[in-house]
Amino acid sequence: MKFIKKLILSLAFIAGISLGASSAKAACSTHLGDFDWDSANIHTAIATFIIEKGYGCDVEVTKGSTTPIMAAFFDGQIDVITELWEDNLVELLKPHFADGSIIHMGTNTPASEQAFWVDRATAEAHGLKSVEDMKKPGVWELFKDPENPSKGRMTSCISGWTCYTINYVKLKEYGLDELYTNFDP
């Protein structure tokens, strides 16, 4: 009789824990936005794992490019974005940071920056210290575009990404568009 009483109490306890976990899981859910680049995919996968396994919550993930994911984020359809290139969205983010509707929780990769890059050996060999130096006579030939041999090639971002447009505008503003193509890798 003592054994059966313990067994019933144990089963009741396990059932109670199970029901509690199910209720908590149903009450705890979040929607993550994921972008179309690898580091964002990794950060979102890690966050999903922690939220599901560590907190027992349901997680829905929507993948897409910057424009639709950010539109859904601004509309409140997405709760969390684990990685964002703020430089691409400064003006769109400012009012949301100011009114508190979006909270910046920290920086994933503090050393990351968007810029035009040249390897050190080439830069030192040809005295390239700023973007203005890319206009020096003959410099564009160091980066000759095989598809357009009359220009150099600036490898940009994937067409459709915000940074592609930013780089396109920068090439024009810096006066480099006459010398270089904005190459879509």
Report residues per predicted region.
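Short, well-ordered beta-strand elements
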Residues: 26-39, 57-62, 150-155
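Sec/Tat signal peptide C-region and signal peptidase I cleavage site
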Residues: 19-26
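Bacterial N-terminal signal peptides
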Residues: 8-18
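Positively charged n-region of N-terminal signal peptides that target proteins for export
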Residues: 1-6
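Ligand-binding cleft/hinge of the Venus flytrap
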Residues: 47-55, 133, 138-181
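A conserved helix-loop-strand patch within extracytoplasmic ligand-binding domains
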Residues: 101-154
